């Protein structure tokens, strides 16, 4: 198939564009061994709010078919010609190894663009070699997303986690400052910085705050 036409979102928080897919349906790593959503995905922002609007949803559904075109990599490289920063997946994940391989090629062919890719697909063995190749590229930061919302991290990896409040930040974490900037990144580019090993996002949004509250109460009872 040819004639790929990738479509991009521009999250209000972000200083750049993003390429996204439908949340959860393209997130096989969002569930634990029992088939239940992990805490971080249970409170996912991309399943509510403006992400439910038809025009936003249709963009993600379009991309879910569009990446399968033979010329998708070429189309993405052309689109990123003027992008100095780019985020993959403000919604969804690289659920298919063929997609992951194509994303790697886009990254290789756009050395002028700094790519940030959050993912949970490291849980599956077949994705690990592709992720390792991405991590070798100087213009790419792959952040392995923690499943927890109480500050749990994936030790020894470039990662991100969710914390209940700023007081839960550990010394080895860099807290996302968007909560101090009306939800905006501002001039911060920590998520694209290989030297920043752990980014901690303060829980926000009704769904996530409820999830955090329930887990804290459970821990206190135990």
Segments predicted by a language model, with ranges:
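Class I S-adenosyl-L-methionine
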Residues: 1-222
């Amino acid at each position: 198939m040819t004639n790929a036409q990738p479509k991009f979102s521009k999250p209000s928080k972000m200083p750049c564009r993003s390429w996204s897919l439908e949340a959860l349906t393209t997130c096989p790593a969002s569930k634990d061994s029992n088939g239940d959503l992990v805490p971080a995905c249970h409170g996912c922002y991309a399943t509510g709010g403006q992400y439910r609007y038809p025009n936003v949803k249709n963009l993600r559904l379009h991309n879910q078919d569009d990446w399968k075109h033979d010329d998708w990599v070429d189309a993405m490289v052309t689109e990123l010609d003027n992008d100095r920063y780019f985020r993959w997946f403000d919604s969804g994940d690289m659920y298919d190894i063929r997609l992951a391989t194509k994303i790697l090629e886009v990254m290789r062919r756009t050395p002028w663009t700094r790519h940030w890719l959050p993912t949970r697909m490291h849980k599956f063995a077949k994705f690990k070699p592709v992720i390792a190749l991405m991590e070798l590229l100087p213009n790419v930061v792959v952040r392995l997303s923690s499943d927890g919302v109480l500050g749990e991290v994936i030790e020894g990896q470039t990662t991100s986690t969710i914390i209940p409040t700023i007081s839960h930040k550990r010394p080895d974490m860099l807290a996302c400052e968007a909560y101090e900037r009306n939800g905006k990144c501002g001039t911060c580019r920590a998520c694209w910085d290989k030297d920043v090993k752990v980014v901690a996002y303060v829980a926000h949004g009704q769904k996530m705050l409820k999830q955090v509250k329930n887990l804290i109460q459970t821990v206190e009872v135990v």
